[in-house]
Amino acid sequence: MKFVDEAKILIVAGDGGNGCVSFRREKYIPKGGPDGGDGGDGGDVYMVADENLNTLIDYRFTKSYRAERGENGQSRDCTGKRGQDITINVPVGTRARDLATGEIIADLTVHGQKQMVAKGGFHGLGNTRFKSSVNRAPRQRTMGTPGESREVLLELMLLADVGMLGMPNAGKSTFIRAVSAAKPKVADYPFTTLVPSLGVVRMDSHQSFVVADIPGLIEGAADGAGLGIQFLKHLERCRVLLHLIDIDPIDGSDPVENAKIIISELEKYSDKLAQKPRWLVFNKVDLLDADEAKQKAQAIVEALGWEGDYYMIAAINQEGVKKLCWDIMEFLKVTPREQDIATALAAEEKVDFMWDDYHKEQLENPDLEDDDEDWDEEDDDGVEFIYQR
């Protein structure tokens, strides 16, 4: 199945049903009084994380999702039926962003996590609500409010503990094949990897971590060169980044300049991503003598001004790979995950537009909201609508 990590959709919550103007008409009961019921609330739109999904391709074809409208109120004080909610299933790791405001309205990182993304409209009031000692035959009612409508950008970001970045042909796919059961394509030409892939590294029966492999970066990626930086977002949730450097590039390029290009493109994309813990990993050391490889690695480290530790590996024959993986495992044990925005979104949210406040104001000040054009004192069947401006 094709890997799609972005999609735009329209979500529309249901409108609230209108209130009803009705009077009780029954034999032997003169002046029965008002009995118009309230409308029903509009349906809400929810998103749910589903671990059985791994792509957003379905949302490239179905772009509009609408919840059901609440039914209007009826006579005999019958309340309208509430609109049915709809649920949109998305892969775990999906983030939903409101395109109009840029606000993140959902970030689903756990299977089964559910988040409301569009609130249904509130129901209107029937004329029964407006009866009083001085107004025994009210002809007022309120209309239901519109449901929320949003144009949303869905972004799928892989959930991994470790992210790999580097130039094309730095050996990222070879590394992930060496440490996990993942089998990404490996070949001797650039951009063999076209889509991100995940591999689970099992150190023993109780310890493991997930590695993400993304397509290589080249100079100008931030401006769209190569495959651009569209896949860097998959590294945002990682706790540590492995910067793989080909210690002896077959094309004769300078490893120092290659490393600087990656660092520069990383900073252009996101300061937050550039500040994540990053380890230098020199790959393909088997192509050089041991002493020559050490001298070359040390020269690169000094040229970059690198002050942290670095590793020398040969992913193709797993030289130095085991030690690197155990060091990663120990680092992850003491490095907690960043608190997801989903934690805050999952907390019980307070709706700004409160039902009680909305109707209390209308009931207390019906005369202030009258629309004179809708009222005819000479027409016994006239109905007065109350609008919230």
From Swiss-Prot:
* Subunit-level organization: Monomer.
Matching SUPFAM superfamilies: Obg GTP-binding protein N-terminal domain (SSF82051), P-loop containing nucleoside triphosphate hydrolases (SSF52540)
Where in the sequence does UniProt note compositional bias of the Acidic residues kind?
364-383
Give the main localization category: cytoplasm
Q: What GO cellular-component annotations does this UniProt entry give?
A: cytoplasm
Q: Which GO terms describe its biological process?
A: ribosome biogenesis
* UniProt-recorded name of the protein: GTPase Obg
Q: Which residues form the OBG-type G domain?
A: 160-333
